[in-house]
Amino acid sequence: MEVENINVDAFVPAKKAQKRSAVNNQDTEMQVDQATGIEGLVAGSTQASAPPRAKRIKSELRKVSVPPHRYSSLKEHWMKIFTPVVEHMKLQIRFNMKARQVELRVGPETPDIANLQKGADFVKAFLCGFEVDDALALLRLEDLFVETFEIKDVKTLRGDHQSRAIGRLAGKGGRTKFTIENVTKTRIVLADSKIHILGSYQNIQLARRAICNLILGSPPSKVYGNLRSVASRLSERM
């Protein structure tokens, strides 16, 4: 009786090979921390790193609500706002039309976390009524602020008295407002009973003092004289 040579390897179950590969994968994924000596999964695992990343993104987010009267203006000038925020500040920005909010977020290429606050201030300044070119100064220059107050914070006026006060602040053809802006090196927006001033802290105080004097009834010529004298003294100090 002849005995045939049987290839035993053909009958070896494939489970053992799968187990070896599984063991090898475990060896490559497990790593010992040199500092603590604790063995664990590699830090590059997506499951381990996902929660801290999600938490960090949530904290590095700014939402700016869009007033109804600035909705169309924002859509018209969107590219002028989008370009400097993305290209120069390296931030991520989008207009959430459902919530009517502008959302800014830190991106992987953002050099400084402070850029997020600068970008939010820039968007807020535009929504307050400032021109895009004027609001861009918040991105280019340091120590600039936007201060907002109402006429009733200075003096309680109603009806025609409030309208006349707003007229005194603007002047004929906007002359009074432009004069205050040029002397104090600020930008002013008259939005009904609200007044927004963009500039440095010291210049904002000068402009606010002049505006308060006009609201209280001082003649424009007297306010101009006081402004010029204060501005000349400041220039001499500098």
Curated annotation (Swiss-Prot):
Keywords: Nucleus, RNA-binding. SUPFAM superfamilies: Eukaryotic type KH-domain (KH-domain type I). The keyword Nucleus applies. GO terms for molecular function: RNA binding. One of its GO terms (cellular component) is nucleolus. Pfam families: KH_PNO1_2nd. Residues 162-211 form the KH domain. It is found in: Nucleus, Nucleolus. CDD domains: KH-I_PNO1_rpt1 (cd22391), KH-I_PNO1_rpt2 (cd22392). It comes from the Eukaryota. The keyword RNA-binding applies. Belongs to the PNO1 family. PANTHER family: RIBONUCLEASE Y, RNA-BINDING PROTEIN PNO1. This is RNA-binding protein pno1. It comes from Drosophila pseudoobscura pseudoobscura (Fruit fly). The lineage of its organism: Eukaryota, Metazoa, Ecdysozoa, Arthropoda, Hexapoda. The gene is l(1)G0004.
